[in-house]
Amino acid sequence: MSNEFIYGIHAVRAVLDKEPERFIEAYVLKGRQDDRLMPILNELQMVGVSLQQMTRKTLDDKAHGANHQGIIARVKPAKQLNENDLDDILAKHASPLLLILDGVTDPHNLGACLRNADAAGVAAVIVPKDKSAPMTATVSKVACGAAETVPLVRVTNLARTMRHLQEQGIWIVGTAGEATHDIYQAKLTGSLAIVMGAEGDGMRRLTRETCDDLIKIPMAGAVSSLNVSVASGICLFEAVRQRLASQ
């Protein structure tokens, strides 16, 4: 498996805190004095990571023009989680909150959804292997460290995985514009998985049919839908609100 690149202060910090053994080397902007960056560089050196100073143009080229904040790191790939890891993840949570993404293939959207999931205390994000954005430096950067903290589980058969979750007592709600009730009318407490479909196409038919319930976000304006990362944030934090209120 090939090595990966991560860039940006948040992404590098997250790996450094959780899995420092993954670092191979780091590239830093020559002459940069940054109060947020210097502690990271010191810690990288303490764990034996080689630092190479580079010009801004060289770093920009390595990051393909994205905002690298003066640091890029080459790391060993993270362990890939699959359906066999789900039971261990669920066992760590009394009432797990899960996010299922069906067909989210844009890396910016996946990264933003991971960031939402981290903020909402989601136990895991579940995606299908064949219809999801791969883990890239862009996903990691947009996630601001959440790609390194939130378990991302890639499954072979999403509908089968959903049925397994249901057997474990997890209620699964899918988001769909044609749903008859909205997220503010739905009960989003207890062991719960929220399913978000691809922007435009929504959930695939079998995914939709496997859900226990369908809900929608009430829309008062002219647009008919929201970006999937925005929609996931709204749904997750309505679930968080209800869960806090029920304590």
From Swiss-Prot:
The keyword Methyltransferase applies. Signal peptide: none annotated. It catalyses: guanosine(2251) in 23S rRNA + S-adenosyl-L-methionine = 2'-O-methylguanosine(2251) in 23S rRNA + S-adenosyl-L-homocysteine + H(+). Its main location: cytoplasm. GO terms for cellular component: cytosol. Its EC number is 2.1.1.185. GO terms for molecular function: RNA binding; rRNA (guanosine-2'-O-)-methyltransferase activity. It is found in: Cytoplasm. S-adenosyl-L-methionine binds at residues 197, 217, 226. Gene3D superfamilies: 3.30.1330.30, 3.40.1280.10. It holds the Pfam family SpoU_sub_bind. Keywords: Cytoplasm, Methyltransferase, rRNA processing, S-adenosyl-L-methionine, Transferase. SMART domains: SpoU_sub_bind. It comes from the Bacteria. Coiled coil: none annotated. Specifically methylates the ribose of guanosine 2251 in 23S rRNA. Belongs to the class IV-like SAM-binding methyltransferase superfamily. RNA methyltransferase TrmH family. RlmB subfamily. This is 23S rRNA (guanosine-2'-O-)-methyltransferase RlmB. The gene is rlmB.
